[in-house]
Amino acid sequence: MKKILLTLSALVLLAACGPKQTYEYPFQNPKLKIEDRVENLISLLTPEEKVGLMMNKAISVDRLGIPSYNWWSEACHGVRQDGYTVYPQPIGMAAAFNPQQMYDVFSQVSDEARANWNRSDHDIFNVPMGVTYYPGNPELTFWCPNVNIFRDPRWGRGQETCGDDPYLTGILGLQTVLGMQGNDPHYYKTHACAKHYAVHSGPEPLRHTYDARVSQRDLWETYLPAFKKLVVDGDVREVMCAFNRYEGVPCCSNDRLLTDILRNKWGYEAIVLTDCDAINNYFTRGQHETQPDALHATVDAALHGTDLECGKTMMALTEALEKGMISEADLDAHLRRTLRGRFELGMFDPADMLPWADLGEEVISSEEHDALATQAARESMVLLKNNGVLPLSKGLKTVLVVGPNADDVALLNGNYGGTPTENHKHSLLEGIRAALPGADVRYSKGCELADDYNTIYHLPEFNDGKGMFVEFWDNNDMKGKPAASGYYNTLNFSTFGAYGFAEGVPTDKISVRIKGRFTPSFSGPMSYTVSSDNGYILKVNGRVVENAKPGMGGMRGFGFGRRGAEYKTFEVKAGKPVDVEIEYRRGAGPFAMLRADFCERKYADFAAEKQMAADADVIIVIGGISAQMEGEGGDKADIELPAVQQRLVRAMHETGKPVVFVNCSGSAIAFASVEDQYDALLQAWYAGQGGAKALADVLFGDYNPSGKLPVTFYASTKDLPDFLDYSMENRTSRYFKGQPLYAFGYGLSYTTFGYGEGKLSKGSMKKGGKVTVTVPVTNTGSVAGAETVQVYVKSLDNPDAPIKGLQGFSKVQLAPGATQKVSITLGDEAFSFYDASVDGLAVRPGRYQILYGSSSRDEDLKALDFQVL
């Protein structure tokens, strides 16, 4: 032992006497405080370099060994690239009412992000200088979560959120941030970003022009709480200011939002960044027009709180410096925050100093991650109606699966998602067939999503059934060999909420050629629709039929699905082959988009489907909408189930067979007109790569559904206020005075639960106190299941308060006959409302009811009286 100690001592001495690591500049020394390293680096930068570091594509500073970096990456429900795990859309994961699962999901997402970073060389002494990174390259800064309130179900981007309730949104958004950023005391695993700050939820086409004006009560009680929770409790490292104006001032220059509230009230010290090209809205004609030009717009944003721009307009700050409109000290204040962000992510430190250095590419799309994605999909599904049809027996002999979403793999990815690996791409139809290997599972698409235009390019007569052949070039001129190519059954390419066009092909300069040959079985007009960001050329049999310049055909139809598409025609003859070709070149705008469809317009009478159902044991209709009908840039015009699908449901009901409707959407759909036409309704959202297995598990009883609605399902579009009205009056479960079709928090199970008499730990409390409600819950059915116990607070003395507001919940798993006491504690936050005297929320004394139960419906709740002194 003595000899060993002497040897160790000698080694320590040798280490101490060995050569010390030397650094050319102090900022390179990881032993120094981050503050000192940041100040040193700032002192070494020229004014031009400082400006170049204030945009999302931050420049490289070769002389200092600083590589370029792209701040923009997305991870709404998985890293937004090809070949990564795709989890359910956040709106679906919110339906699980499972904060721990949300944390686990985003911990895995950040694992995959770090693994991607690790397999690329980002050491500042080794990375080739001058490299420019584009979305799709390894990044550590992710612009999620979206914690806007889903106030109106027509909003296209509501699927990215956690619903229409500020409490639920805050709780789940917080877990997203914690999972993304990690818990290391020295480094952040990745950066999360709270967006879009603050009063922002459509309409999408007006987001660059509208001025959100709301009462201070709505601001503080609805629109701000989730942001505050992420900032104060989550230490979120980035906040994205929204496109729109608030009270007349663009959000990215808004002193009220960025300085008074975010920095001063909440103590936020990290990065504020813009949505992409938001500063351009300041001076672009027909948009905000609050500034005359790019020069004044960038100065306005920089002097009023914006640290980092997604775009390149801030290059004008160099001219602003020369003209004395802004000082170098002003730039330094912004750089202290952005550069600190890169240091705290460990970008300038040796890789082996970071706790995630051993994460390799084996974690990317791993089986462990797929298992959680599948479990998250199971928990997301909400059973809204069941006349005893579900669960289905695995002994069924014949099943008819019909509907436009049944065999669409891309549907499951939703908005702002990547794409899974090939072995994890399975349609909902495939999931059902896998669960019934011995049954006759018949399939018909039945109809398209929203009208009687029937897509034909996936049929056998089109390119021998392969679909359309698409070639992608990494230049604007289709020069050289294509960078990628393949056959596609869906022509829907976009960087709006998507990772790109084709794997490995950067989209900053891209051109595309789509080709197909088909032999029509009919004579007459062939319908087509094409939309792009920069025009297109359509050729039929080598002849140019349409040469749409930018702005012609342009963005028309984006985000609205077929309801907003414009159709044109050309004539075809039965039996005569037709060659079609589309050429596209990306424009100069911030987003790229190309969508096309070739269709035969034919009224769907569903006679064939009725015949297929004649000897079926059950009919499973898989419909709803898709991210092509709701997403960034476009909203739904109404919330009704598309008319053609209503006809489909009625036709299937007429067969007399049991009908199970599986609805895929990222928002509430109004089913009132067909609610009596199906025997069971399952809300499946956009379920990610595990959706096929999850749906089958739920339908056939391998998993007992436990999801609860994170939004209100209204009976009709007529129940909704004006989309442009940001007042919360008569919106969501907190203020809606009507009768919803399916209420917030509602969801059935294959078992039943009974609620005993709840008890409060005390009958009153003062500010700073806490009260605990304890509720006995019993599984009164015959199968195990999970129940989400929900607690709402209703003020009896405050006429301006919500009708009731969610203030706590707990999900419990119970065996048949088992009883568990569930305790939920409420503090000041549950009894706080807007108070003008404090310019914010304050505890309000008075009489309250603490409500507990299985949903927000009055009939599902029991009340306990309580008082705040």
Residue ranges and their predicted role:
Residues 16-526, 531-834, 840-858, 867-869:
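Glycoside hydrolase catalytic-domain context in secreted enzymes
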